[in-house]
Amino acid sequence: MRIHHWVLIAGLLVIGTGCNTKAPSPQAPALLMPATIKDIMDSMVEPSGDYVFESVQEISDEHGITEKAPKTNAEWEGVRRHLFVLVEAPNLLTMQGRKAARPEDRSRNPLVENEPEEVQKLLDADRPSLIRRARRLQDAAVLALKAVDAKDKDALFHAIDGIDKACENCHLHYWYPNDQRAREAAKEDGITDY
C-alpha cells in the first residue's frame, strides 16, 4: 500500500510540474520609428532649444543693458523641462535605423544645405561621428541642467553656449556644410570639428 502511495505522489508531482511549465513567450514586436531626425529636430529639439536660449539673455537697447534670467521656481522649472528634452533627444536622434528625413522632404536652400539623401549618406558612412556629436549636445545640456538645479544664471549662460556650439558643430557637418558664412562664424567661435 505504501508503495502505491509513493507512486501516486510521484506521478502527481510529474504531472503538476509538466502543467507548470510556460510556453516561451513570443518576441515583443519592434517599436515603431516613424519620426525622422528632421521630425525630432523640428518638433522637439528646436522648440526646446529656443526656450532655453531665450531664458538667459543680455538685451542691449536704447535703455541700456537688461539681463533676462529665470527668477521664480516656475521659471527655473520651465527651463529644466526643456533641458530634459535636449538631454534625451540625442538618444532618439541616434537610434539605429532612424532616417534623416522623409523621401518628400527637400532642402529650402540647396546651394548651402544638403538634401536629405546627402545627409543620410553622411550618417550611414560614419555612425560613430553622429553619436559623438549627439553626445556633445547631451553633455552640454546636462551641464545646463546642473546650473538650473543650482539656480545659477551665469553657469546656465555658459552652458547654453556649449549647447549652441554642439548644435552648430553637427549642423555644419550634416545640414549646411557649404555655408561659408556659417563656417567662418564657427571658426571665430572656436568651433572647428565639423
Regions found by a protein language model. Give the residues of each.
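C-terminal motif of bacterial Sec signal peptides marking the signal peptidase cleavage site
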Residues: 15-18
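Sequence context surrounding c-type heme c attachment/ligation sites in exported
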Residues: 20-80, 84-87, 91-194
